[in-house]
From Swiss-Prot:
GO term, biological process aspect, one: cell division
PANTHER family found in the cross-reference section: KINETOCHORE PROTEIN NDC80, KINETOCHORE PROTEIN NDC80 HOMOLOG
Protein name: Probable kinetochore protein NDC80
Primary role: Acts as a component of the essential kinetochore-associated NDC80 complex, which is required for chromosome segregation and spindle checkpoint activity.
Location(s), subcellular: Nucleus; Chromosome, Centromere, Kinetochore
Pfam family, one: NDC80_loop
Coiled coil (residue ranges): 323-489, 587-682
One CC-aspect GO term: nucleus
Subunit structure: Component of the NDC80 complex, which consists of NDC80, NUF2, SPC24 and SPC25.
Alphabetical list of InterPro entries matching this protein: Kinetochore_Ndc80, Ndc80_CH, Ndc80_sf
GO MF, any single term: microtubule binding
Family per record: Belongs to the NDC80/HEC1 family.
UniProt biased composition (Polar residues): 21-41, 67-76, 90-105, 120-138
């Protein structure tokens, strides 16, 4: 009878609740299934076929289907050969009863008691992408820099005072059984840091147990808490927190204190108002969570033989308390809604009065649009008319000026004609002579105009040549300046330079100062200095402009200088190659020395670390002894100053300690009684369950025996029984 029948067993590993979603998809335990006899068993007494109770109707809103949770099985699949009719509805597939395999539960209507927990339709918009506090995020590249001024003494004193006040407020010394001195946050010992870190982390995660050394425990915990600067903390620093590293660990303790305060505030609903300001109402979620947690706790504590009515009676107070909490939560919204409805009615009435007292808005809008269109058209027409008027005014002014000029010219022509007529009359010239003279004058005027036109063309060409010559002269001056600069750089200028060898290489433009290449002939006088020529028939030569013969002596000097520089360059290259070989040898020697220096530096660092550790231990011991001596001296002085006052204080402390001890004794007795009661209840449940299992096994054995007798006969049954006994 050691076969696994698929029933629930106390030897199976305890099933976890798995992930609980926001709508509380908490699974229902197997103990909630109602076990009652069914008529399916026929003539068999105590039939093993279990009928499941119908689904209990919930008072809350419908909940989505329960998730598929896994449970492990430790039995075999021997019963699957033909005894499926005597089993209750299995929560696992028949093909996976091997040890260590996880099977999924199939939650169906009727195989378990329906949960009273149903989903509520939240009125708050869904917030996606919730991120767990301990979820791992990609770490940024490099070691992040702490922006806090941890090296500042005033900042250290302030955060140290905050940490000390927080520990005193939450009974650090009583919980950790460790006394802290006043200077513990200025020069702490390794033991002080260990106690403070463990206590602060227990404020964040009370169920954590420290089992390793502190230098091995802290790094993974910092990664789990997602401390932003955990990469800047090494194990060697954790093993020696004093000295220069204390500011870093003081910032770590302050950050953990703030994190613990934030978690306490979250538990104490301190951020509900901030959620309300952000438009998220969490009061309903808290009511639902309290209902689910309290109701589920009582539901698990119920006896599995209770009926649906008794279960509903047990859960009814929780439903009523949830309804009352929702009524209290919704009362302010109801009053606000009433106020808003009254305000809405008042505003609607005002709108109706305004609509009655004012014309139709549609007609007004239509008229307004027409007037806007007319306004735009009038503005455009006005702008066009203004432009035309300005144009006509300017044109009329110009025409008036031209008319005045024409009138003046006409008057002058009339006067000239009258004067000429008088002169002609006085000379006695006939009209034929006047016509002939006029024709000759016109011919000469045309000749003068053609000559003037040719002269203008010649002057234009000459001015272009002058501009080109001036540009060429500017370019020549720039090239001479660039030549002189480069010659000075390569030591050719002055004549006393290294490469000049007493010769003159400096170029100069020797054009006469009184020559003006930019003066146009059209505007120049008869002087030859304003021409681009030396005289009326000769222009400037290259030798007249530059002081040196570039194509002769200067070119030969440059060729010889280039050859000499090439020889010196070849010699310098040979010397440089030799120097490079020597430098490579020196570098190899330096690398060897550098390796030796690094080895010595490593030994020095190891010695310095050992020295620092020894110094820290010695300093800590010295500080502890100094603090103890100072404390003893202060106590001695206080005892000498006022012995009677100390006696009264000690008596009062003794009275307080006695009262506290009595209270602790009473609390311990009450807790002991509560634990004894709980243990008795659990033992009773275990005994009842054991009796139930034994009874079920006996019934099952009898049922199997009857089945085998029917199918195989009494002889075969006896042989099978002997085989089973063997």
């Amino acid at each position: 009878m050691s076969q696994d029948t698929g029933l629930w067993s106390v030897r199976r590993p305890r099933e976890t609740l798995g992930g609980i979603s926001a709508n509380s998809a908490i699974p229902q335990p197997g103990s909630t299934m109602k076990r009652s006899s069914s008529n399916i068993g026929g003539n068999y007494p105590g039939s093993h076929v279990r009928s499941m109770s119908g689904s209990r109707h919930s008072l809350a809103m419908p909940r989505p289907s329960q998730p598929m949770f896994q449970r492990s099985s430790s039995g075999t699949n021997l019963v699957d050969l033909g005894l499926s009719s005597v089993k209750r509805s299995s929560f696992a597939p028949k093909s996976t009863f091997t040890p260590g395999t996880a099977t999924k539960r199939a939650s169906t209507d009727g195989d378990r008691r329906s949960s009273v927990y149903r989903p509520r339709q939240s009125t708050v918009p869904a917030v996606s992408h919730h991120q767990s506090f301990f979820q791992t995020t990609p770490a940024p590249a490099g070691v992040p820099r702490d922006p806090r001024p941890l090296k500042d003494r005033s900042f250290q004193a302030r955060i140290g005072q905050e940490i000390m006040e927080y520990m005193v407020q939450h009974n650090f010394e009583m919980e950790m059984k460790h006394v802290l001195s006043q200077n513990v946050l200025k020069s702490p010992t390794q033991k002080d840091f260990n106690y403070m870190f463990q206590w602060l982390y227990h404020r964040i995660d009370p169920s954590h147990k420290f089992q390793k050394n502190i230098d091995q425990e802290v790094p993974p915990l910092l990664k789990q808490m997602r401390y932003p600067f955990e990469r800047s903390i090494t194990k060697s620093q954790i093993a020696a927190v004093g000295g220069q590293n204390w500011s870093t660990f003081l910032g770590l303790l302050h950050w953990m204190m703030q994190l613990a305060q934030m978690l306490d505030g979250y538990v104490n609903c301190q951020y509900d108002e901030a959620c309300m300001e952000a438009g998220i109402d969490v009061s309903g979620d808290r009511i639902i969570f309290d209902f689910l947690s309290n109701g589920y706790r009582d539901w698990l504590a119920m006896d599995e033989d209770l009926g649906d009515e008794e279960a509903e009676r047990v859960l009814a107070p929780h439903v009523q308390s949830m309804a009352a909490a929702f009524e209290r939560s919704n009362s302010k919204y109801t009053s606000e809604l009433d106020m808003l409805e009254a305000e809405n009615a008042r505003l609607l009435k005002e709108i109706e009065d305004l609509e009655k007292s004012t014309p139709d808005p549609a007609v007004l809008d239509h008229h307004f649009k027409i007037m806007e269109e007319d306004k735009v058209k009038f503005e455009e027409y006005n702008a066009l008319a203004m432009q035309r008027s300005e144009k006509y005014e300017s044109r009329s002014q110009v025409l008036q000026e031209e008319l005045d000029k024409l009138l003046e010219e006409l008057q002058e022509a009339d006067e000239e004609r009258r004067s000429l007529q008088k002169a002609v009359d006085a000379q006695g010239i006939s009209m034929q002579d006047i016509d002939r003279m006029t024709a000759e004058r016109e011919r000469l005027q045309r000749g003068i105009e053609s000559a003037s036109q040719r002269l203008e063309e010649v002057k234009k060409k000459v001015s272009e040549r002058e501009a080109e010559a001036s540009r060429k002269l500017d370019e020549l001056e720039q090239m001479v300046d660039r030549y002189n600069t480069m010659a000075y750089q390569i030591a050719l200028i002055p004549s006393t330079a290294a490469n000049a060898k007493g010769r003159e290489f400096e170029l100069q433009v020797t054009v006469a100062d009184d020559s003006d290449f930019t003066t146009s002939i059209m505007k120049s006088g008869p002087s030859s200095a304003d021409r681009l020529v030396v005289d009326s028939t000769t222009g400037h030569q290259a030798g007249h402009i530059l002081n040196l013969d570039l194509r002769g002596k200067i070119r030969n000097s440059f060729i010889s200088l280039r050859k000499e520089i090439s020889d010196r360059r070849a010699t310098a290259m040979d010397e440089m190659i030799k120097d490079h070989d020597l430098l490579d040898g020196i570098k190899e020697a330096i690398e060897d020395r550098r390796g030796e220096v690094e080895a010595l530096n490593h030994r020095v660092r190891a010695a310095e670390e050992e020295y620092e550790k020894t110094k820290e231990v010695t300093t800590a011991q010295k500080l502890a002894s100094d603090a103890h001596i100072e404390k003893m001296e202060k106590e001695l002085s206080r005892m000498r100053a006022g012995l009677s006052e100390n006696v009264q204080i000690l008596e009062q402390r003794e009275i307080n300690t006695t009262i506290e001890y009595e209270q602790l004794v009473l609390q311990a007795n009450a807790l002991r009684e509560e634990l004894h009661t709980e243990i008795d209840r659990m033992l009773n449940d275990v005994i009842k369950f054991k009796i139930h299992v034994q009874k079920s096994l006996d019934d099952y054995e009898g049922f199997v025996t009857e089945e085998l007798e029917k199918e195989l006969g009494s002889d075969e049954m006896q042989e099978d029984t002997q085989r089973m006994d063997m």
